[in-house]
Amino acid sequence: MRHIFIALALSVGLSAGLAVPVAAKDADQKAIEAIITDQIAAFQADDFARAFSFASPTIKGLFGTPQNFGAMVQRGYPMVYRPNSVRILELREVDGRLWQRVMVTDPAGATHLLDYQVIETPEGWQINAVQLLPQSGVGA
């Protein structure tokens, strides 16, 4: 399932485009940060239904149920499921899509960078993809 999630992230063109920092409206920036941190908090509470509520219709369609989604995150993204710390970094635009970079430290002290693609829907901002970035000495 992790491969599906990463494939989705790659299919939207992250690797093909040029990343440009975004000067998002303050309200949008705060809302984007909130959906990511709120989803992580829901995972920490094992509230998969709440975590699933932050996912886009595309992600909901891929996984079908909060339980399937939660199981995928537990197996494929353990650093998101049980982080030691979370730091929101820059918001960027790549090929017209918004990507929020997040730095997560896992319980063992390893640092991970993730890119969250977010989309605006009638329900507000939602997470449409997450890509775990390759390790490159982050935090060293």
Indicate residue ranges for each PLM-predicted region.
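Bacterial N-terminal signal peptides
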Residues: 7-17
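Exposed beta-sheet edge and beta->alpha loop/turn motif
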Residues: 90-140
